[in-house]
Amino acid sequence: MPELPEVEVVRRGLEKWVVGASFGEVEVLHPRAVRRHAPGAADFAARVSGCGVTEARRRGKYLWLTLDSGEALLAHLGMSGQLLVQPRHAAAERHLRVRLPLTARQGHDPEAPQELRFVDQRTFGHLLVDRLVDDGTGTGLPSVISHIARDPLDPAFDEDAFAAALCRKRTELKRALLDQSLISGIGNIYADEALWMSQLHWATPTEALSRSQVATLLAAVREVMVAALAQGGTSFDSLYVNVNGESGYFARSLNAYGRNDQPCARCGTPIQRETFMNRSSYSCPRCQPRPRHARA
């Protein structure tokens, strides 16, 4: 599933190619793509068609386009969702779910019309239209994600509040990092990478962490995510691409995730894979020793 860096790469592409344009007649080709929009596909198309796009924003793994109607077009990419900006005459992708034609904006060729396409092979992603609520800083946030915590790259992220909440969790450290109501944007890949960088085991009890360990962990999370952003995110297959259909290449820089039995870049010990929450966790048994009082 795309995590913060991948979603931010898509957001930046939307900011470049879609903000300032307006939508033409929206066409929903597969109703499952808008299943979270309770009034249905026809209402979704009617609410988006003709609207102008004023900004592209993100919180954690969610992104949205603010519309001049005062509402937001919210997107969650799920496992395989893609938002692509394509020439309107380009052949339809096999798993094209929603077409959102774009009017020409300043600097774009009106003779080469484009459209935003939502493509989703596994149909776990979705689009919906939602009202905006104040997020406490005077900025609008779609109401359905108002429970999602700020992410570590958000300028308004409160490190002290996070540290206190983390220690109150009394759970495994990785489980806490994956809790989007505590800190958003982190998934399996970047949790493993940040834990490797900070030399903490995923089963470390959160209540046992010192303030300096939390600070080291947050610094690692930010460093990993900034590095991933610079490389366009992590792509293991063709399911994650940016708005121009290009894959990221941070997979070449991973130190832990997916590197079972390969030598640790820091000490040479083979990376080990363990099962956690029905998924895989990767760590170095020497650099990240399992704590004596591990929670799992």
Curated annotation (Swiss-Prot):
Cofactor: binding comment: Binds 1 zinc ion per subunit.
Protein name in the entry: Formamidopyrimidine-DNA glycosylase
Active-site annotation: 2-3, 61, 279
Coiled coil segments of this chain: none
Xref: PANTHER family: FORMAMIDOPYRIMIDINE-DNA GLYCOSYLASE (PTHR22993:SF9)
Record keywords: DNA damage, DNA repair, DNA-binding, Glycosidase, Hydrolase, Lyase, Metal-binding, Multifunctional enzyme, Zinc, Zinc-finger
EC number: 3.2.2.23, 4.2.99.18
Gene Ontology MF terms: 8-oxo-7,8-dihydroguanine DNA N-glycosylase activity; class I DNA-(apurinic or apyrimidinic site) endonuclease activity; damaged DNA binding; zinc ion binding
PROSITE patterns: FPG_CAT, ZF_FPG_2
Gene3D superfamilies: 1.10.8.50, MutM-like, N-terminal
SUPFAM superfamilies listed in its UniProt record: Glucocorticoid receptor-like (DNA-binding domain) (SSF57716), N-terminal domain of MutM-like DNA repair proteins (SSF81624), S13-like H2TH domain (SSF46946)
Transmembrane spans: none
Example of a GO biological process term: base-excision repair
Cofactor entry: Zn(2+)
Organism of origin: Thermobifida fusca (strain YX)
Family of this protein: Belongs to the FPG family.
Catalytic activity: Hydrolysis of DNA containing ring-opened 7-methylguanine residues, releasing 2,6-diamino-4-hydroxy-5-(N-methyl)formamidopyrimidine; 2'-deoxyribonucleotide-(2'-deoxyribose 5'-phosphate)-2'-deoxyribonucleotide-DNA = a 3'-end 2'-deoxyribonucleotide-(2,3-dehydro-2,3-deoxyribose 5'-phosphate)-DNA + a 5'-end 5'-phospho-2'-deoxyribonucleoside-DNA + H(+)
Source species, domain of life: Bacteria
Lineage of the species this protein comes from: Bacteria, Bacillati, Actinomycetota, Actinomycetes, Streptosporangiales
Protein's job: Involved in base excision repair of DNA damaged by oxidation or by mutagenic agents. Acts as a DNA glycosylase that recognizes and removes damaged bases. Has a preference for oxidized purines, such as 7,8-dihydro-8-oxoguanine (8-oxoG). Has AP (apurinic/apyrimidinic) lyase activity and introduces nicks in the DNA strand. Cleaves the DNA backbone by beta-delta elimination to generate a single-strand break at the site of the removed base with both 3'- and 5'-phosphates.
Binding annotation for DNA: 95, 122, 169
